[in-house]
Structures are given as C-alpha cells and as structure tokens.
Amino acid sequence: MAKAVTIKIKLVSTADTGFYYVTKKNSRTMTDKMVKKKYDPVARKHVEFKEAKIK
C-alpha cells in the first residue's frame, strides 16, 4: 500500500477558546503549516485558526 497523500489536521483557534475544526490537506502540495481565518462560535467572531496535529 502506498502512503496516503491527504492527511487529517486540526485547526485550533488562536483566541484560546479551545474550539477547533478538523480538515484534510494534501501533504505534498501544502508543505507549510495551514492558517485560515474562520468563525469561532465560542468567541463569536472570525479569528485565525492554526494547524496542529491530531493526537
């Protein structure tokens, strides 16, 4: 079996609310850490979410 190209990652809120999204990314084309601006329902505003490993 070949190694999977897409990997699951966790996007953790930078507002320190503990909220996170789980998404996939292509590990070959996106080698750097993913940063996205998304809605945090705990903080009730759009904040940056940074990539973290799923444990």
Curated annotation (Swiss-Prot):
Post-translationally, this protein is described as follows, namely: The protein is methylated on either Ala-2 or Lys-3.
Q: Which GO terms describe its biological process?
A: translation
Can you tell which superkingdom this protein's organism belongs to?
A: Bacteria
- Record-linked Pfam families: Ribosomal_L33
Q: Name one GO molecular function term.
A: structural constituent of ribosome
Any idea which UniProt keywords this protein has?
Answer: Methylation, Ribonucleoprotein, Ribosomal protein
Recorded hits in InterPro entries, A to Z, give: Ribosomal_bL33, Ribosomal_bL33_CS, Ribosomal_bL33_sf, Ribosomal_zn-bd
* Record flagged with keyword rRNA-binding: no
Give the GO cellular component terms, alphabetically. Answer: cytosolic large ribosomal subunit
What PANTHER family does UniProt report for this protein, alphabetically? 54S RIBOSOMAL PROTEIN L39, MITOCHONDRIAL, LARGE RIBOSOMAL SUBUNIT PROTEIN BL33M
Q: Please state which protein family the record places this protein in.
A: Belongs to the bacterial ribosomal protein bL33 family.
Mind telling me what this protein is named? Large ribosomal subunit protein bL33
Write down the species.
Rhodopseudomonas palustris (strain ATCC BAA-98 / CGA009)
